[in-house]
């Protein structure tokens, strides 16, 4: 997704995230510039990323890359269950109007997810591109061992990486 360095460039909904793992805390959604300016005043982090908010299904793909065999494996996939954003999604828009509830993204659990077969080649290719790019950026072996691509899949089945974790994230049963 597009990232914004200047709030004046914000033209559509964004999510603002602190750096580092925070268990789903340290996020807020803003509809536009005015909403951002209002919410940033209460935000507790001085360092943050402003990222285009992509509407779709979240997916966490856990990979393992071995520089010895030069092979990448998909170990598992899952989806986070977050309060209160997941329960808000079950309330029709007209039922949300007038509620003074800001979405929160505190992780309460993960559910295994089986990705549609037609999307598997792209999921593998994305992992391979991350490894190849890391080799160019870091030299030598680049990224190796476990890592996770945190993605959003849109209704037209486009896959966007929203974060890269250099580890297996909490949702796997490995």
Residue ranges with predicted function:
Residues 56-58, 67-72, 154-159:
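Coil-to-beta-strand transition motifs
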Residues 63-133, 165-174:
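ATP-dependent carboxylate/phosphate-activation module, predominantly the ATP-grasp catalytic core
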Residues 131-171:
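Conserved metal-phosphate-binding beta-hairpin within the catalytic cores
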Residues 27-60, 75, 88, 130-140:
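Conserved ATP-binding module of the ATP-grasp superfamily
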Residues 1-31:
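A conserved helix-loop-beta module that forms one wall/lid of the active-site cleft
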Residues 60-63, 150:
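Short beta-strand scaffold segments in enzyme catalytic cores
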Residues 4, 19-23, 34-35, 54-56, ...:
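Short acidic/polar capping segments at secondary-structure boundaries
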Residues 21-27, 58, 85, 105:
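Domain-scale recognition of functional cores that engage charged ligands
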